[in-house]
Every structure is written in structure tokens, then in C-alpha cells.
């Protein structure tokens, strides 16, 4: 089973509309869970819904009503852009649920999400009065440090990013940090921008990796 998280400009229907996710999932015999998280950064918002908790509720509810394995080795998580950020967040904080995680074109510097200007997007709804998220549970680097301190077995990581993506350098900086912390990862850059042309290819690679290696 794959928990698949959408990006800031997308919703729970986007992978069905803009990629061949159904065909890929069928070929690998995978169930795909696609929750909607609006513009939440997959966080428990200061002013808004508790989307972090909601994603976990969806995970457990779907596993209750469908005959899906709850074994860690049978459950994976992936997502792009804001969803890649969410993927990394859950990989680092809910490592007992997922054996593999595949962030694609991910936002690893949470401040990027907070500083971003987007239609109907209000980052203060996520952070409240705080404008700097460094050292908080929104900070991916802080979550890496916390996971290392807990000495947890983290999911295997397959990180992908297009070389023409505006987040490419962000990805390079983050994998350097993972290396410094001795956290294993696989990084696969390839030509592509921040769009569904790239994510159609990257999600196909991610699903194949989940089931084959």
C-alpha cells in the first residue's frame, strides 16, 4: 500500500488526472491512498485543521475497512513538492508505519513553504505568529536530528528531483545533510522541471522501487 501525498498546487485527484498512476499501481498490484490536505504542509495547523493527525487517521481507517497488510514492509509513502515534504516528515516521525519513502521534487527547507506566495495560500494559518520555523516540528532538518537522537530504524529513502527544478539545489543540500548524519539514501536526479510530466515518470520509478528493491 502506498500513501501518496499531493503538492501545494494539487489535490487528491491530481495524480488520477495528470499521471498514469492507476496503470502503474495495477501493474505492481499496489493499493494507493490519496488523501486531500489542502495547503496545510501536512501539519497540524495553528489556524485550521489538524492535517498531520488526519493523514494518520486515514492510514489506519483505510487499513481497517480494506484487506490491506499492516506490516511495515508492505507499506510505503511518496509525494511531490509539498507532498514530498510531507513524505519526509512522516518518514522521520512515523517510521514504524513505512518501510520505504520516496520524496519527489520535495521541499526540504520548510521555510520555502512559509515564504511562498500562492493564490489562497496563507502560511500563517500553518505557523501562527511564527515566521521562522527553524528548530520546530515543521523543520525537516530538526526532524532528522530528532530521529537520529532516537536511534530509530528509518524507512529506506529514494529521493528524486529534476535537474531543471527550482528545488534542485534544495535537494542537494538536504542529501548532504543526510550523508553527514549517516542516514542511507538513494538519490536519482534526471532531466525535468517542477511539473506532472516529470512526476508521471518519477512516481512510476518510485512504485517499481517499492516492490522490486
Model-based region annotation:
Residues 1-213:
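Non-catalytic cap/lid and distal C-terminal segments of serine-dependent acyl enzymes
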Amino acid at each position: 500500500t502506498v500513501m501518496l501525498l499531493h503538492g501545494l498546487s494539487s489535490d487528491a485527484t491530481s495524480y488520477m488526472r495528470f499521471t498514469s498512476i492507476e496503470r502503474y499501481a495495477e501493474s505492481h498490484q499496489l493499493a494507493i491512498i490519496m488523501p486531500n490536505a489542502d495547503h496545510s504542509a501536512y501539519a497540524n495547523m495553528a489556524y485550521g485543521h489538524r492535517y498531520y493527525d488526519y493523514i494518520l487517521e486515514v492510514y489506519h481507517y483505510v487499513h481497517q475497512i480494506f484487506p490491506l497488510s499492516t506490516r511495515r514492509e508492505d507499506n510505503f509513502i511518496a509525494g511531490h513538492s509539498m507532498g514530498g515534504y510531507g513524505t519526509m516528515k512522516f518518514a522521520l516521525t512515523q517510521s514504524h508505519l513505512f518501510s520505504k519513502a520516496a520524496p519527489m521534487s520535495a521541499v526540504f527547507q520548510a521555510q520555502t513553504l512559509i515564504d511562498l506566495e500562492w493564490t489562497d495560500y496563507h502560511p500563517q494559518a500553518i505557523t501562527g505568529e511564527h515566521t521562522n520555523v527553524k528548530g520546530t516540528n515543521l523543520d525537516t532538518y530538526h526532524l532528522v536530528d530528532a530521529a537520529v537522537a532516537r536511534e530509530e530504524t528509518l524507512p529506506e529513502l529514494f529521493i528524486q528531483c529534476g535537474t531543471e527544478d527550482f528545488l534542485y539545489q534544495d535537494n542537494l543540500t538536504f542529501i548532504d545533510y543526510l550523508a553527514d548524519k549517516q542516514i542511507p539514501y538513494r538519490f536519482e536526479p534526471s532531466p525535468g522541471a517542477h511539473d506532472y510530466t516529470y512526476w508521471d515518470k518519477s512516481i512510476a520509478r518510485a512504485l517499481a522501487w517499492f516492490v522490486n528493491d
